[in-house]
Every structure is written in C-alpha cells, then in structure tokens.
Amino acid sequence: LTCLICPEKYCNKVHTCRNGEKICFKKFDQRKLLGKRYIRGCAATCPEAKPREIVECCSTDKCNH
C-alpha cells in the first residue's frame, strides 16, 4: 500500500506503508478554512477523530488525497 504524506491540499509525495499498515488516512481541523493543513499517512487502524477534527480513511493506493 502507498499513501500520500504531505500537508498541502495538492499532494504528490508518496510513502510505502509498512507491513500491518493497511489504511491511508487524512485528517484536518474543520475550523480552519484558510491555510488548511492536512495530516496524511499510513495506519494499521483508522485514527479516531478528536473534537472538530475530520478523519477520512481508505485502503487503496494514494486514496488519501
């Protein structure tokens, strides 16, 4: 599995996940509309969203755009 790993909206930096990491995720703060920073990466399970945070998980290559 390969996931995107950069914080910008348009990301093309790809990371190969380790064994056991079968999920790509993207999370961001729903309050910040301007200058939004995304946290992307690989995970074994989908990270839990904190208050006012949006987390999206998927399981195909580069799906966390």
Curated annotation (Swiss-Prot):
GO terms for molecular function: acetylcholine receptor inhibitor activity; ion channel regulator activity; toxin activity. It comes from the Eukaryota. Gene3D superfamilies: CD59. It is found in: Secreted. CDD domains: TFP_snake_toxin (cd00206). GO terms for cellular component: extracellular region. Keywords: Acetylcholine receptor inhibiting toxin, Disulfide bond, Ion channel impairing toxin, Neurotoxin, Postsynaptic neurotoxin, Secreted, Toxin. Disulfide bonds join 3-24, 6-11, 17-42, 46-57, 58-63. Pfam families: Toxin_cobra-type. InterPro entries: Snake_3FTx, Snake_toxin-like_sf, Snake_toxin_con_site, Toxin_cobra-type. Signal peptide: none annotated. Expressed by the venom gland. Binds to muscle and neuronal nicotinic acetylcholine receptors (nAChR). It binds to extracellular domain of rat alpha-7/CHRNA7 nAChR (IC(50)=2.2 uM) and to Torpedo californica membranes (IC(50)=30 uM). Negative results: does not inhibit GABA(A) channel composed of alpha-1-beta-3-gamma-2 (GABRA1-GABRB3-GABRG2) subunits. Belongs to the three-finger toxin family. Ancestral subfamily. Orphan group II sub-subfamily. This is Oxiana weak toxin. It comes from Naja oxiana.
